[in-house]
């Protein structure tokens, strides 16, 4: 009789461990493939590590360069345009 009870408990505990392991693995893969791309969810979880979707530092450096770089880009774009003929 004790053999049957022990076997039943072993199966029950093994099933719970397998289910928990699958849930943890599923969360890990979903987090890394999809959810970590959203800054809002990273802030909720408290993940401050650099992720693929985290572009704060490059965008911060670009915004500092934008005031000086954007007029040059506009000028170069205007210079490349062919002159418009008013007679046609």
Swiss-Prot record:
Keyword Transmembrane among record annotations: yes
Coiled coil feature spans: none
Modified residue annotations for Phosphothreonine: 63
Topology with respect to the bilayer: Single-pass membrane protein
Organism annotation: Mus musculus (Mouse)
GO cellular component assignments: membrane
Record key words, sorted: Membrane, Phosphoprotein, Transmembrane, Transmembrane helix
PANTHER family documented for this protein: SMALL INTEGRAL MEMBRANE PROTEIN 13
Segments crossing the lipid bilayer: 10-30
Location in the cell: Membrane
UniProt name for this protein: Small integral membrane protein 13
Modified residues annotated as Phosphoserine in this record: 59, 61, 70
Highest taxon in the source lineage: Eukaryota
Pfam families: DUF4750
Family: Belongs to the SMIM13 family.
Bias-annotated ranges (Polar residues): 48-61
InterPro entries named among the record's database cross-references: DUF4750 (IPR031851)
Region of interest called Disordered, as start-end residue ranges on this chain: 48-88
Main location: membrane
């Amino acid at each position: 009789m004790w053999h049957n009870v022990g076997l039943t408990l072993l199966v029950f505990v093994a099933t719970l461990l397998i289910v928990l392991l699958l849930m943890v693995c599923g969360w890990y893969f979903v987090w890394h493939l999809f959810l970590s791309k959203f800054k809002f969810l990273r802030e909720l979880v408290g993940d401050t590590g650099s992720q693929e979707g985290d572009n704060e530092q490059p965008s911060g450096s670009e915004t500092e360069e934008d005031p000086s770089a954007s007029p040059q880009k506009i000028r170069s774009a205007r210079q490349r345009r062919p002159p418009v003929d008013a007679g046609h």
